Design a protein with these regions (language model features):
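Non-catalytic substrate-recognition and accessory regions of acyl/acetyltransferase enzymes
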Residues: 1-130, 141-227
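Hydrophobic positions on the alpha1 helix immediately C-terminal to the Walker A/P-loop
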Residues: 138
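A short glycine-leucine-enriched loop at secondary-structure breakpoints
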Residues: 132-134
Length: 227
């Protein structure tokens, strides 16, 4: 049965893996994972409903550069699924962003020596709350409150499809299902690609990944939420 949405989404962190020194713990130390409960806080304090879950990861660019770690090494040791294999779609051998990629819709893209690269791995909205454009709300809240210093943002459509964790696989395949109904994952991704393109995020080749600047996404998501 469809729930009545009260109109006030909130993200509650379920714990964070803190950054630690890569000199002691390897390249993977420059990544941080964030897990969130998505709640509807529009009702009374005694009536806060769970709406869904979200999972994000963050690459500390300042720590990466300070320790002489290349973006390629950082991608290869990413805790997220399938990031490393798409490196060549975005970067040259010198670590510069490909001009062919920039032509797909990202005009000005670069890695600063501070800030971060954020990856939106999973946003799962319970089917009872479908139809309220909550994915856009969740992403906007995350960028405004948890990713203010970010330079780049990844969006992944089906990030856990190769994971051995069957529960996560089942959850991941439900991403955006209620907003982008289709008969196959590929069709879902194509529809999602059209949606992301409208808000400033081009698809990376034929992969299930999308890429753009945080600022372009903020502008685009505002536009999408107005329509």
């Amino acid at each position: 049965m469809k729930k009545r949405f009260q109109g006030a989404i909130s993200l509650h962190s379920k714990g964070t893996e803190e950054f630690i020194s890569p000199s002691d713990f390897g390249v993977s130390a420059i990544w941080k994972i964030r897990d969130f409960d998505i709640t509807d806080c529009g009702g009374t304090a005694e009536n806060i409903d769970m709406v869904g879950e979200a999972e994000m990861s963050c690459l500390n660019l300042e720590m990466m550069f300070d320790n002489g770690i290349t973006i390629q090494d950082a991608f290869e040791d990413s805790p997220t699924i399938n990031i490393a294999e798409y490196y060549d779609e975005i970067f040259t051998k010198n670590g510069e962003i490909r001009k062919s990629f920039l032509k797909n819709g990202v005009d000005e893209l670069g890695l600063s020596t501070a800030g971060a690269l954020h990856i939106l791995q999973l946003v799962f909205i319970d089917s009872k709350y479908s139809g309220f454009n909550l994915v856009a709300n969740v992403t906007k809240i995350y960028l405004e409150n948890f990713a203010r210093n970010t330079d780049l943002v990844f969006l992944q459509a089906f990030p856990l499809q190769h994971s051995e964790d069957t529960d996560l696989v089942k959850k991941a395949t439900k991403i955006y299902r209620h907003d982008f109904t289709a008969n196959s994952k590929e069709t879902d991704i194509k529809r999602l690609a059209e949606h992301y393109k409208r808000i400033g995020f081009p698809r990376i080749g034929k992969t299930a990944h999308f890429f753009g600047t945080a600022e372009s996404f903020r502008v685009g998501i505002e536009r999408a939420m107005e329509n």
